[in-house]
């Protein structure tokens, strides 16, 4: 019995060292060769069996899986999985508690970011403002050019109007001398339009003349013959350029000169031997008789006598043009 234990003490360490070497060789074999894995496991199991029989050891003692069998490997993997599960359980999961308050650095960073955004927006506004300023300058220059062009156009229109006025006056003067009465350095032309005295003067002026202003009795007699021939057999009063609007009884021509002679109408004188009438003839009173109500002078077309009338009365008129 002592010999058996002695043999076991000598053989078992060698077998165990062989088993560990076999397992190391197995690992090398699995890593490098992998061809005789099953054969090595069978040899190892057989040697352990013989050793147990020689020593009289029970089948359950010793290394339960000395050769690293598949069952031992599975147990080792299970233990590894359990260890990983324990590590996962031991790993603390992040809590869902309230987030920590921002630090001063975070606040400063946020403020700087907002300021950067505001600065970028302000830069865009400056760019747009510059574009608007450029547009305003362009529009101002265009408006100035338009004003200059409008001024030039206005000057051109005024020049055309002046030229048209001169042409109309020249046309009226030529028409007056061609169609009317030429007398010395004057031409008289009768107009059969009914106008007030001021309107008649304006129309004569627009045609380059004025209302008739007979300078002496010779011109007065020539004008009388012209009006009688133009309006016969009727008797029409015709406006002359004579009035006393400035002062009652002070008769002036339209050019401001004082009238040097008069041809006022006088009522018929009674025949010799007849009783003189105390009152003037009601249809032909002596002129002027209107006072301040009648300040303009018209000439009768039949005899050339002068009558004072209300200046607003609408009558024929005769224009005078220089020749």
Swiss-Prot record:
A motif (Cell attachment site) lies at residues 61-63. O-glycosylated. Probably sulfated on the O-glycans. GO terms for cellular component: cytoplasm; extracellular region; extracellular space. Residues 1-21 form the signal peptide. This is C-type lectin domain family 11 member A. GO terms for molecular function: carbohydrate binding; growth factor activity. Promotes osteogenesis by stimulating the differentiation of mesenchymal progenitors into mature osteoblasts. Important for repair and maintenance of adult bone. Keywords: Cytoplasm, Disulfide bond, Glycoprotein, Growth factor, Lectin, Osteogenesis, Secreted, Signal. Expressed in skeletal tissues including bone marrow, chondrocytes, primary ossification center-associated cells, the perichondrium and periosteum. Lower levels of expression were detected in spleen, thymus, appendix and fetal liver. Residues 74-90 have a biased composition (Acidic residues). It is found in: Cytoplasm; Secreted. Residues 55-106, 272-295 are annotated as: Disordered. Residues 183-320 form the C-type lectin domain. One of its GO terms (biological process) is positive regulation of cell population proliferation. Coiled coil: none annotated. Disulfide bonds join 204-319, 296-311. It comes from Homo sapiens.
């Amino acid at each position: 019995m002592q010999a058996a234990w002695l043999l076991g003490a000598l053989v078992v360490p060698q077998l165990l060292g062989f088993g560990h070497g076999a397992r190391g060789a197995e690992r090398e074999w699995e890593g490098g060769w992998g061809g005789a894995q099953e054969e090595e496991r069978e040899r190892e199991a057989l040697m352990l069996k013989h050793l147990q029989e020689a020593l009289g050891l029970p089948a359950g003692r010793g290394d339960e899986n000395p050769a690293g069998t598949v069952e031992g490997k599975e147990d080792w993997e299970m233990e590894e999985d359990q260890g990983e599960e324990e590590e996962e359980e031991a790993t603390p999961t992040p809590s869902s508690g309230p987030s920590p308050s921002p630090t001063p650095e975070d606040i400063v960073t946020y403020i700087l970011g907002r300021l950067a955004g505001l600065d970028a927006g302000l830069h865009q506004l400056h760019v747009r403002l510059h574009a608007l300023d450029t547009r305003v300058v362009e529009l101002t220059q265009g408006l100035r050019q338009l004003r200059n062009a409008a001024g030039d156009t206005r000057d051109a229109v005024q020049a055309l109007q002046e030229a048209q006025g001169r042409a109309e006056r020249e046309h009226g003067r030529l028409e007056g001398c061609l169609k009317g009465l030429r007398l010395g350095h004057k031409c008289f032309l009768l107009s059969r339009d009914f106008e007030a005295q001021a309107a008649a003067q304006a129309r004569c002026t627009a045609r380059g003349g004025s209302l008739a202003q007979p300078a002496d009795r010779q011109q007065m007699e020539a004008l009388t013959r012209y009006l009688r021939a133009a309006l016969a057999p009727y008797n029409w009063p015709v406006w002359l350029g004579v009035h006393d609007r400035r002062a009652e009884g002070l008769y002036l021509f339209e050019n401001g000169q004082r009238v040097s002679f008069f041809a006022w109408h006088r009522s018929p004188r009674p025949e010799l031997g007849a009783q003189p009438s105390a009152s003037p003839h009601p249809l032909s009173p002596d002129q002027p008789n209107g006072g301040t109500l009648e300040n303009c002078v018209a000439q009768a077309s039949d005899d050339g006598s002068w009558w004072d009338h209300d200046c607003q009365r609408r009558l024929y008129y005769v224009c005078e043009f220089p020749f």
